[in-house]
């Protein structure tokens, strides 16, 4: 039985009210909730049910060419944050609106389906009287061109999008133009593309802005201070420890831990995190002048030996490396000892003259990313040669990176490391920054200058700025 748009919406809305909207939908005649699990972004190959795929396909068949408002996309982004998975590729059509280009899995939550179906109903209602009777299969909002049918990997018969390694150069600002017009010659790295990227990332940042006692973010407990800055918080789902502002970050295939500069009260936990992670490199991007400023409360923990609770730390400087433009990296080795635990040695890369809320050049960023990657690889090889159980554990052997807040310089470096990894060749700048923001907080890549460096690195690789 093929459900009409109104029937599908009615059944989905009832289930959202009766069940959890986080359940995925399934369809065999009528819509039902898969109560056994919440959304995991599965495909048929990775464990999604055929009935889940049919549900997703059916919803998709009703939302082709549907224009999503900023409010619609904000609701989808809330789902992305909640599940730590982005299920949707959206394309801007101007004026803050978007269309759904593709679905990244064979599943869809009931709540997301409700958002999409309500957008379709709204557009259908608004289109009455504006389209002829023979065009009901391609309804579109007034003043908006009829766009190509929704491409979904669920339907192999539909034409594919252009390859990700060749950035899409048209269609982002085509509202009001006929489909037969010549292809746009707008540069994929020009002002229009940059403005669109900035707009999308700003929308995401606003969606992720923390409210008071926001359940999406880790909250301090036991009277201890958790965050250096009230607005720079730690995503609860990816938190490394309950007492640290530190997150597991995975951008494509690049896995790291991003954190704030530890508070004095957090040092024992911070060292324990470094040891348990078998940290292959600690990259400290906070400047020496910041550390020396007593008002900032930034303990000089990695350049000095000391005792922190039950943990004893020995620090030894090993070398200094020039990165270009006068930017220097001081190298240290931290030896962490705790009774009853293995002694752990952690290489440290400290960039002591990168000022807060600024960007170093793309050349310096590349050199720093390469130094951090090489240092980490050497240490990983050591653990592998010793048969360490940390090898193969995705939660361990991650570079730990922080500046002061852990969002600006930290994110610039993580983005560059991601682009250094050939396995991430299909990721756009939008992908990378969005994944960092969803997994830590909305301020990752804090300053425009830092985003500009990532854009320049992407342009040098022919990497797209925007999702297709």
UniProtKB/Swiss-Prot annotation:
Active site (catalytic residues): 403 (phosphocysteine intermediate)
Gene Ontology MF terms in the entry: protein tyrosine phosphatase activity
Disordered as annotated region, ranges: 127-194
EC numbers: 3.1.3.48
Database matches in Gene3D superfamilies: Protein tyrosine phosphatase superfamily, Protein-tyrosine phosphatase, YopH, N-terminal domain
Matches recorded under PROSITE patterns: TYR_PHOSPHATASE_1 (PS00383), TYR_PHOSPHATASE_2 (PS50056), TYR_PHOSPHATASE_PTP (PS50055)
Annotated protein name in UniProt: Tyrosine-protein phosphatase YopH
Protein source organism: Yersinia pseudotuberculosis serotype I (strain IP32953)
Primary gene name: yopH
